Regions:
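Short, small/polar-rich loop/turn modules that mediate ligand/substrate recognition or access, typified
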Residues: 91, 96, 151-153
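Residue(s) in the substrate-gating loop at a strand-loop-helix junction
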Residues: 59
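A conserved structural motif in NAD(P)-dependent oxidoreductases
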Residues: 125-136
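Conserved small/polar residues in nucleotide/adenosyl-binding loops
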Residues: 169-174
Length: 174
């Protein structure tokens, strides 16, 4: 395996004071431990061959946090820590490790959002739309290519300029 893409992600949203240990643990197990379990088996071969590309799909919410997503944001921030550490460990062995932090992308996860919530999100994306999966795929393809051989420990933020916009909820969730 020359290129590995770790793309684990589930949501179990709840405000922190209502979050259950089960919600916390399920998200940690999938989003963080899943990344470890995806990369760890192929890492020795990359080291032996002195070549490898590790790409982790994190999230805008791992960069900025998000109301009701303490568990998800923690895992996606943890993914960035994994990338930065692996970049340092792998650099002398020809291995790069980078992340892509998508904003809201037209996936099943986003399609399951209530319509009003999605409208509010789109209203806060300066590009005026959610991203498309192929836009993230092109970021991954670039990071896997020879054109990115000196890019290591970096993050591509693909979010339509949404980076530090906060979504405010007006429900009784708080």
């Amino acid at each position: 395996v020359d290129v590995v893409v770790a793309n684990a992600g589930i949501l179990r949203d709840a405000p922190f004071h209502r979050m259950t240990p089960e919600q916390w643990n399920e998200v940690i197990a999938t989003n963080l431990t899943g990344v470890f379990n995806t990369i760890h088996p192929v890492w020795p071969g990359m080291r032996e061959r002195k070549f490898g590309r590790v790409i982790v799909i994190s999230s805008i919410n791992g960069q900025k946090g998000q109301f009701g997503q303490v568990n998800y944001a923690a895992t996606k921030a943890g993914d960035l820590g994994i990338v930065k550490s692996l970049a340092q460990e792998g650099a002398r062995n020809g291995i790069t490790a980078n992340a892509v932090c998508p904003g809201y992308i037209a996936t099943e996860m986003i399609a399951s959002m209530p319509e009003k919530a999605l409208e509010a999100v789109i209203g806060q994306i300066p590009a005026g739309r959610v991203g498309e999966p192929d836009e993230i795929a092109r970021c991954v393809a670039f990071l896997a290519s020879d054109d990115a051989e000196f890019i290591n420990g970096s993050t591509i933020s693909a979010n339509g300029a949404q980076f530090f916009v906060c979504l405010l909820y007006t429900s009784d969730a708080a």
